């Protein structure tokens, strides 16, 4: 399992490591509980790998944790969320943003499956 953590904040500081530890241990609310179009006031996003047992198969998945301005964590295990969040992390770091707004987007695939994505909004 990969221990690499990608985040908008410094994960080598005590504060950064505490955020990751708390996200891993508490998990926070699921992104699935957010309404389509919900705006999250974020102060950080991090991604890390975890092993999950899916119907008897162990597989490594990317967890995306969004840290909110009010101290909560919203988490998701989703390929589309991970892809969007990875790009958001890059932009937030490039422009050195301390806080930013993320919009939750729920969509349906052609087969009727619901999936989520994230948008960076001003």
UniProtKB/Swiss-Prot annotation:
GO terms for molecular function: DNA binding. GO terms for biological process: DNA replication; viral DNA genome replication. Keywords: DNA replication, DNA-binding, Early protein, Viral DNA replication. InterPro entries: Phi29_Phage_SSB. Belongs to the phi29likevirus single-strand-binding protein family. Single-stranded DNA-binding protein required for the elongation during viral DNA replication by strand displacement. Displaced viral DNA strands are transiently coated with the ssDNA-binding protein and therefore protected againt nucleases. The latter is then probably removed by the replisome that performs lagging strand synthesis or during the events that lead up to the recombination process. Has helix-destabilizing activity since it removes secondary structure from the ssDNA in replicative intermediates. This is Single-stranded DNA-binding protein. It comes from Bacillus phage Nf.
């Amino acid at each position: 399992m990969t221990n690499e953590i990608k985040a908008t904040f410094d994960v080598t500081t005590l504060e950064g490591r505490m955020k990751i530890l708390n996200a891993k241990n508490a998990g926070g609310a699921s992104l699935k509980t957010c309404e389509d179009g919900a705006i999250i006031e974020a102060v950080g996003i991090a991604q890390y790998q975890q092993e999950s047992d899916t119907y008897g198969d162990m597989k490594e998945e990317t967890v995306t944790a969004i840290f909110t301005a009010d101290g909560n964590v919203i988490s998701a295990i989703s390929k589309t969320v991970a892809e969007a969040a990875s790009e958001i992390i890059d932009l937030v770091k490039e422009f050195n943003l301390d806080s930013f707004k993320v919009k939750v987007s729920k969509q349906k695939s052609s087969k009727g499956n619901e999936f989520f994505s994230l948008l960076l909004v001003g």
